[in-house]
């Protein structure tokens, strides 16, 4: 029996009225209609870029390079028995994956909305590109208009946008950070024409940009426990590192209610709160005991790192978000059902548990909404066992009781809309159970010191 | 016997030699070597033999190696590397490391810099395990054999990946000199990011160097020399020293003649390309 692919990412504008979700290689947009409480489909975009084409281009390019190199070195062309030279020319062949080759997933990552809420940004794995969409709220056919698709040499792993919404900063899997003006034309030969503005010798996991005291900064986090703060646009001047993590960093955020604070999490079993201006760690919140009851067989370490008892479990924070106007953070550990909400004391900067919320399935993503009327979290779930229910849960703050709770009715309405959008059997996001994209890959960033010499 | 892995034969001379040296290292690596140690030992230590420390010439700087590095520069225990400069009454070091030799190889430069800069602590960083062991054994032997006048107390080596973890060891503006001697050329285009001088890494080197600190580079590969010069000249925080400065600088002389690679190039009558750069002060922040 086929199912609608679980949602990998969900974001909304500040009011929570416009919602964008990623299913497989599709982005879909909905608008919440206040009058009838329903979600209307506003637009859809599918990544149809074929990786085969890219491989073919790469193969042709490599062949041309080898031919040129042979020419230069004066290597003789092969000869037939009669002594005639023959020009060997092959069509570029697209390599066909052999049996047991890992499947290719055209993931869409790093979904985010610009500060002025007129653009949606994302990254496509297929051609390692950054996608910029204009959100045309008045276009009833499709509100998502792709205005830029810029491929990068290595896969973008995290992106952010500057406060003026003019520049996207891209951190890639190879450790390089690029800055791209949205309005500039697409660069074809990105390898030759684009220089990174800064870099780590490590996979990058997060990037932020912020302004403090009239100075602009870029923060980057990596697999080697580092959080680096550089000036911007003078990104060649490193301001400082924030040292303290002992495992990889997977998620960093700066709350808008206090831009001197940076919060980070990852493979360590604690949430770190920093005064990044001073470069000091102010607090660490250990979540081990909270999370342990929710750790399951998905967290067993890979065989080659497993202990003799076969019970070594490894887990890490997948994502950490902060509410823009209130001193609350929320995070979840990968492959758990538990959402943890923390409150920060704004005078002592100590974190304490505000609330735990158990979701019906494992959480795959979290984002926030917040305006003067409402605030809370958009949560997507690994609902593959649910029979096409519970794709998303909206969690909102009840200001009278100061507690967060799941908005069941609204969440159900959204789920109905998803089913309506994708219920047809031939829908691109209909998959078999074993075709679901990998949803849990943060823990694979954990280092085990595999290489000795 | 598997020739690529001589450790499989537990009685090979190399394994016996390495085991013996490892025990020696364990005992002496972090010990304050002075006349009393010498009296106990009563004999001179032989310098290590390079042929027992062979290993692959390259190491992938992107790999997940088993490395020891401090969480931050504040956590670094320098007393273990430079016990002679540790004041046990205050619990503090009397000096900080100010010179770093990145990719120090077999340690030739360290050993020649030691007497030339007696007031500085000099650290070599090397990513290859056996090569690091060799340098450690060499320093242990030299310290022991010169215990009377406390020579070679100001140099040491750590096994590490400077491309990833340099800022874990050094504070901002801690270093006055950094050496990059005969680095791995990484000829292939797609491996250029693995080179030790890239525009992104230079920003990190600039962070640990103080104003007017010097980056020294030397290589026998002209392409790599041009690459390093290009990137250093393009970087806003570095400015090249002229030929006259190079000719009058004692480090350039030592670097040209001291390193094992330098000697090898000398024997083969190859070229040596030198370039030195001054760390400029940060410009005004815009």
Swiss-Prot record, chain A:
Q: List the disulfide bonds.
A: none
Q: What is its main location?
A: nucleus
* Keywords of the record: Nucleus, Repeat, tRNA processing, WD repeat
The residue spans of each WD repeat are 103-143, 244-286
Q: Where is this region: Disordered?
A: 69-99
Origin, by domain of life?
Eukaryota
Identify the SMART domains for this entry. Answer: WD40
Known pathway: tRNA modification; N(7)-methylguanine-tRNA biosynthesis
GO BP: tRNA (guanine-N7)-methylation
**GO molecular function of the protein, one example?**
enzyme activator activity
State its location(s). Answer: Nucleus
Q: Which InterPro entries match?
A: Trm82, WD40/YVTN_repeat-like_dom_sf, WD40_repeat_dom_sf, WD40_rpt
| PANTHER family on file | TRNA (GUANINE-N(7)-)-METHYLTRANSFERASE NON-CATALYTIC SUBUNIT WDR4, WD40 REPEAT PROTEIN 4
Oligomeric state and interaction partners are given as:
Forms a heterodimer with the catalytic subunit TRM8.
For this chain, the family text in UniProt reads: Belongs to the WD repeat TRM82 family.
Protein name, per record: tRNA (guanine-N(7)-)-methyltransferase non-catalytic subunit TRM82
Look up and give the organism this protein is from: Vanderwaltozyma polyspora (strain ATCC 22028 / DSM 70294 / BCRC 21397 / CBS 2163 / NBRC 10782 / NRRL Y-8283 / UCD 57-17) (Kluyveromyces polysporus)
> Upper taxonomic classification of the species?
Eukaryota, Fungi, Dikarya, Ascomycota, Saccharomycotina
Q: Which gene encodes it?
A: TRM82
UniProtKB/Swiss-Prot annotation, chain B:
Keyword check for Heme = no
The UniProt catalytic activity note for this protein reads:
guanosine(46) in tRNA + S-adenosyl-L-methionine = N(7)-methylguanosine(46) in tRNA + S-adenosyl-L-homocysteine
Q: Where does it live in the cell?
A: Nucleus
Q: What GO cellular-component annotations does this UniProt entry give?
A: nucleus; tRNA (m7G46) methyltransferase complex
Entry's EC annotation: 2.1.1.33
Q: Which PROSITE patterns does the UniProt record give? A: SAM_MT_TRMB
InterPro entries, sorted: SAM-dependent_MTases_sf, Trm8_euk, tRNA_(Gua-N-7)_MeTrfase_Trmb
**Pfam families from the xrefs?**
Methyltransf_4 (PF02390)
Q: Which residues form the active site?
A: 184
What are the binding positions for S-adenosyl-L-methionine in this chain? 103, 126-127, 161-162, 181, 259-261
Task: Describe the subunit structure.
Answer: Forms a complex with TRM82.
Q: What is this protein called?
A: tRNA (guanine-N(7)-)-methyltransferase
Q: What is the lineage of its organism?
A: Eukaryota, Fungi, Dikarya, Ascomycota, Saccharomycotina
């Amino acid at each position: 029996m086929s199912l609608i692919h679980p949602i990998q990412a969900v974001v909304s504008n500040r009011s929570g009225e416009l919602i964008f979700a990623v299913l497989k290689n599709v982005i879909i947009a909905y608008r919440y209609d206040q009058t009838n409480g329903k979600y209307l489909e506003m637009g859809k975009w599918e990544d149809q870029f074929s990786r085969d084409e890219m491989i073919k281009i790469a193969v042709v390019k490599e062949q041309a390079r080898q031919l040129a190199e042979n020419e230069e070195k004066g290597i003789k062309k092969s000869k037939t028995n009669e002594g005639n030279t023959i020009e060997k020319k092959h069509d570029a062949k697209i390599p066909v994956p052999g049996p047991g080759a890992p499947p290719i997933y055209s993931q869409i990552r790093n979904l985010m909305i610009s500060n002025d809420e007129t653009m949606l940004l994302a990254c496509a794995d297929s051609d390692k590109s950054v996608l910029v969409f204009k959100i045309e709220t008045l276009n009833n056919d499709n509100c998502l208009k792709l205005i830029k698709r810029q491929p990068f040499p290595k896969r973008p792993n995290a992106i952010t946008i500057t406060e003026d919404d003019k520049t996207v900063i891209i951190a890639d899997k190879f450790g390089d950070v690029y800055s791209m003006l949205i309005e500039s034309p697409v660069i074809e030969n990105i390898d030759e024409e684009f220089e990174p503005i800064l870099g780590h010798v490590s996979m990058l996991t997060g990037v932020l940009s912020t302004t403090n005291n009239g100075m602009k900064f870029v923060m980057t986090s990596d697999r080697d426990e580092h959080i680096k703060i550089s000036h911007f646009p003078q990104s060649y001047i490193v301001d400082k590192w924030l040292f303290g993590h002992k495992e990889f960093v997977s998620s960093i955020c700066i709350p808008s209610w206090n831009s001197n604070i940076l919060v980070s999490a990852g493979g360590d079993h604690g949430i770190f709160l920093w005064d990044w201006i001073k470069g000091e760690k102010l607090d660490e919140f250990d979540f081990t005991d909270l999370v342990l009851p929710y750790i399951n067989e998905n967290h067993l370490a890979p065989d080659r790192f497993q202990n003799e008892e076969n019970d070594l479990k490894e887990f890490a924070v997948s994502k950490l978000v902060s509410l823009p106007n209130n001193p609350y953070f929320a995070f979840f550990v990968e492959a758990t059902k538990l959402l943890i909400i923390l409150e920060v004391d704004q005078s002592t900067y100590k974190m304490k548990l505000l609330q735990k919320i158990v979701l019906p399935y494992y959480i795959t993503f979290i984002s926030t909404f917040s305006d003067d009327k409402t605030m809370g979290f958009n949560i997507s779930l690994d609902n593959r066992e649910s029979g096409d229910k519970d794709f998303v849960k909206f969690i909102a703050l009840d200001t009278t009781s100061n507690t967060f709770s799941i908005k069941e009715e609204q969440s159900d309405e959204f789920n109905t809309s998803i089913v309506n959008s994708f219920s047809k059997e031939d829908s691109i996001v209909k998959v078999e159970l074993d075709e679901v994209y990998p949803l849990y890959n943060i823990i694979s960033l954990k280092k085990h010191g595999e290489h000795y010499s | 016997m598997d020739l690529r892995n001589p450790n499989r034969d537990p009685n090979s001379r190399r394994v016996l030699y390495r085991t013996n040296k490892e025990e020696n290292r364990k005992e002496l690596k972090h010990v304050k070597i002075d006349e009393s140690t010498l009296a106990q030992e009563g004999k001179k230590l032989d310098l290590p033999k390079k042929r027992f420390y062979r290993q692959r010439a390259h190491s992938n700087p992107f790999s997940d190696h088993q490395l020891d590095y401090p969480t931050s520069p504040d956590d670094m225990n320098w007393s273990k590397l430079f016990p002679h400069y540790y004041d046990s009454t205050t619990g503090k070091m009397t000096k900080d490391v100010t010179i770093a030799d990145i990719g120090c190889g077999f340690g030739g430069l360290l050993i020649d810099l030691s007497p030339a800069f007696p007031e500085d602590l000099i650290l070599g960083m090397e990513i290859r395990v056996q090569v690091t062991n060799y340098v450690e054994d060499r320093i242990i032997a030299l310290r022991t054999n010169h215990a009377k006048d406390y020579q070679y107390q100001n140099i040491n080596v750590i096994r590490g990946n400077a491309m990833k973890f340099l800022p874990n060891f050094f504070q901002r503006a801690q270093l006055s000199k950094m050496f990059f001697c005969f680095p791995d050329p990484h000829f292939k285009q797609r491996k250029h990011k693995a080179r030790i001088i890239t525009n992104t890494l230079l920003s990190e080197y600039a962070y640990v160097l103080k104003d007017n600190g010097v980056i020294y580079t030397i290589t026998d590969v002209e392409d790599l020399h041009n690459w390093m010069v290009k990137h250093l000249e393009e970087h806003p925080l570095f400015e090249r020293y002229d030929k006259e400065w190079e000719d009058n600088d004692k480090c350039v002389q030592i670097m040209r003649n001291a390193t094992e690679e330098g000697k090898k190039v000398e024997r083969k009558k190859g070229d040596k390309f030198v370039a030195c750069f001054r760390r400029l002060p940060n410009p005004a922040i815009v």
